Structure formats: C-alpha cells, structure tokens
C-alpha cells in the first residue's frame, strides 16, 4: 500500500540518506514534525500517514508485516533505494519489522519509546471509549469533542493529541479496525537479529522500554544502544525534543 506522505527537500547541500518519520497509534504525519523541522536542515524528509490513519488508505489488516510492506511500497513510489527510519511507538515497531522484510532498504534505524515485544497489555481502552463517545455524539468541532473526551480522559495533552485527527466532525483514523486489530498493534512476532547499530530512545518515566525487555531487545537488535531521556514519558519527542534530536544527530553522525 502506498501511503499518504509529506515530502520536504533538505535546506542545505548534503550526502545524507533521506529520513522517513513514522508516527504511532492514533497519530498522523504531523506528529513527528518537531523532528522534521530540525532534520530537514541536511536531510530530505518523508513524513507518512500509516495505514488506517490520516489520509492513507483503509484496510482491515493492521499488523507489522503489512505496515512494513507499506513502507517499502512508499519508498518504491518515491524512487528511494535506502533511507533512515525514525519511528515512535507503533511506528517504531513498523520500522523494526522492516528489518525482517527488506533490511537492504534501511540505512539507520531509530525507535522512540518502544521495544520489539508483545506487551500483552491494553493501555488504550479509555482512549477508545473517549473516541467512541465523540463518534456517537453530534460533535462537529474540536471544542465540542474535547468537552466529551474530558469525561473519559484526564490528560489534556492526550486529548489535544487525539483532536489533531478530528476534522469536520470525523476521526481521520479508522476506529473499528484499530479496535479490532489492537492485539496485533500491542503484539509482536519475534524477528531475526538485525546486526547493525540501532538507536532506541526510551522515556525515563515510560513503561514501554523497561529492564524486563532488555534480553528480547538485544536478541533481535544485538548492536542496539539506548539513550534514555530522563523525565520524559511516552511522548518523548514532544516533551524533550532537544534531547531527542541531540541523541538522533549523534547516532546519524557516527
């Protein structure tokens, strides 16, 4: 599946590989914009809407092999042989899955606050309840939707993040498929070891990349290095963009 993208040309001359930015669950291509705005200085940038998100096509399947194939199809459509991939959460898993499908298309890999594991946890049921409450109402504006969502969610930052995908009274993500396929999204099928340097950027306050996942991570990414961002939660890049960009640039320049 060819994904909806936003492509930007680097502002300065360079020999760097293009960077593909891959968002997480309930997101869109805007979500890693804080990284794009810096990295476009010396890299061509592709931001993607993942399947069933934003303006990309809808499909009943939402697993990581399918998402990885979408990334290959999108590279092909842009006539890009090889790229650096930076993915957050679900997007990070999609990028990791790409190592098993088409490792020759990857220059470098960055996974932000995610590990290659099956989490076996439902962390988003309250979010689904809030989203469905808006869908069942006659809310047309983000202000109306926010009032409904506050009955289900306490974190204003999460509400505002979700509302970026509420346009003209409609959600831009495919709620029924995301609900149906949720076990695949939190899940993971182990992949063969990818024996190249990869950067993992966990948030110090996030449960997504804890010590219990270390062995699984190193079995699949034996040359992984982690740069923990102290004081950050799951949305590391939004909370501590400068620290995340420093870690990414150090890795890209090695």
Swiss-Prot record:
InterPro entries reported in the protein's UniProt record: AB_hydrolase_1 (IPR000073), AB_hydrolase_fold (IPR029058)
CC terms in the record's Gene Ontology section: cytosol
Active site per database record: 89, 234
Superkingdom in the source lineage: Bacteria
Enzyme class: hydrolase
Pfam family, one: Abhydrolase_6
Keywords: Hydrolase, Serine esterase
Keyword Signal attributed: no
A molecular function (GO) term: thiolester hydrolase activity
Record EC number: 3.1.-.-
Family: Belongs to the DmpD/TodF/XylF esterase family.
Role played: Displays esterase activity toward palmitoyl-CoA, malonyl-CoA and pNP-butyrate.
Name recorded for this polypeptide: Esterase YbfF
Species this chain originates from: Escherichia coli (strain K12)
Organism placement in taxonomy: Bacteria, Pseudomonadati, Pseudomonadota, Gammaproteobacteria, Enterobacterales
Gene this protein is translated from: ybfF
